[in-house]
Amino acid sequence: MKTLYSLRRFYPVETLFNGTLSLAGRDQETTGFAWWAGNARLINLSGKLLGAHVAHAGLIVFWAGAMNLFEVAHFVPEKPMYEQGLILLPHLATLGWGVGPGGEVVDTFPYFVSGVLHLISSAVLGFGGIYHALLGPETLEESFPFFGYVWKDRNKMTTILGIHLILLGIGAFLLVLKALYFGGVYDTWAPGGGDVRKITNLTLSPSVIFGYLLKSPFGGEGWIVSVDDLEDIIGGHVWLGSICILGGIWHILTKPFAWARRAFVWSGEAYLSYSLGALSVFGFIACCFVWFNNTAYPSEFYGPTGPEASQAQAFTFLVRDQRLGANVGSAQGPTGLGKYLMRSPTGEVIFGGETMRFWDLRAPWLEPLRGPNGLDLSRLKKDIQPWQERRSAEYMTHAPLGSLNSVGGVATEINAVNYVSPRSWLATSHFVLGFFLFVGHLWHAGRARAAAAGFEKGIDRDFEPVLSMTPLN
């Protein structure tokens, strides 16, 4: 079944460094790939490829568990999470574990449990990976036809797609269950400065949920990244989980239609390129979400967003100068615009100065001071609470702008501290990874299309310098 075509013709891109070197019995002569091409040697060995994937999952889960325990071991409850370079504990805290009112950590034991569970799981995955890579059957088709596949088998491929979609849907519903029944999640908008609460009144209205998808990505619109209440987030997961599970069942039960059979390339490398493209999109969306959204990524754990730190600075100095007798409603700044307050293009009262560009920021410490027409002057004069002053001063000095030498905050700010915000780390890393995944998508898509069209011959190797060199062994 697997030898319907010559591997040579199907995988013609070769580089002969040392054709005789054989790793685990899979040499260049039999697979068409040299040792350094890694899992490409396993393209038609479903059992060994399974081992590679399970082992990879084990490495991922091991990192999660080990890094989790590392963060727990270094965690200081007296300092905010974002000052300690943590990237995993904020996620656990956001899910409502170990935190109380205001995002204060009251118990680190759940974090320890999470780390240990991941470590134990990684051992199981690691064993399975090594077993399937070294001892298990090379191919699954003969002994376990349910788990076997041929890359060209369109029906089997969409069945596998369906199984993956169902698993993703179950994952979405796990968050829903946590929010509804298992202790709730952290809500930065809870009255009095954030708390863990169960979500009771889900947003299931399709016009609201899918309205986010139809919004513009710019300015105050912000596409799905603009979501700012947990009811919408959890309701969105109900919709997404349902769509994934129903779509998964659909793909398991049906065969691809003729237009889909014609439109797609049906080979292992093509599926790799589709997956890389999807992961790339995930990375770019995650980048924007963690950078701009302070509901899904509460500022109590991740530090303020860029716009939030900027608005916090304007607010802090408004409070200071108002105490010193300034009339913040009418004071004029160096540009002739309002020094503390001005109007937005649509007429709302907003903070003046350089932070005007961030006038559409929404944050739990600022919203109580807004009225129907933007910031309410009488509330700014009479209603500012001490917790709002404390929080804005804290956020002002923790802007997510880390320079290379890790001086956090605004470069000219004398109160800045030595730190880089986890928002900076998470946004930058996901952007960079998303970009590289996109390049990988283009690369493998190009190769897969060329191979399907039958003209991928690779570089002409007749005059390669390496051919005149002595073999490595």
Swiss-Prot record:
Main location: plastid
GO molecular function, one term: chlorophyll binding
Record keywords, A-Z: Acetylation, Chlorophyll, Chloroplast, Chromophore, Manganese, Membrane, Metal-binding, Phosphoprotein, Photosynthesis, Photosystem II, Plastid, Thylakoid, Transmembrane, Transmembrane helix
Record: residues binding [CaMn4O5] cluster: E367
Modified residues annotated as Phosphothreonine in this record: T15
Cofactor binding comment, as recorded: Binds multiple chlorophylls and provides some of the ligands for the Ca-4Mn-5O cluster of the oxygen-evolving complex. It may also provide a ligand for a Cl- that is required for oxygen evolution. PSII binds additional chlorophylls, carotenoids and specific lipids.
Bilayer topology term: Multi-pass membrane protein
Annotated localization: Plastid, Chloroplast thylakoid membrane
Residue numbers of N-acetylthreonine PTMs: T15
Transmembrane segments: 69-93, 134-155, 178-200, 255-275, 291-312, 447-471
Alphabetical GO biological process terms: photosynthetic electron transport in photosystem II
Assigned protein family: Belongs to the PsbB/PsbC family. PsbC subfamily.
Function summary: One of the components of the core complex of photosystem II (PSII). It binds chlorophyll and helps catalyze the primary light-induced photochemical processes of PSII. PSII is a light-driven water:plastoquinone oxidoreductase, using light energy to abstract electrons from H(2)O, generating O(2) and a proton gradient subsequently used for ATP formation.
Assembly notes: PSII is composed of 1 copy each of membrane proteins PsbA, PsbB, PsbC, PsbD, PsbE, PsbF, PsbH, PsbI, PsbJ, PsbK, PsbL, PsbM, PsbT, PsbX, PsbY, PsbZ, Psb30/Ycf12, at least 3 peripheral proteins of the oxygen-evolving complex and a large number of cofactors. It forms dimeric complexes.
Designated name of the protein: Photosystem II CP43 reaction center protein
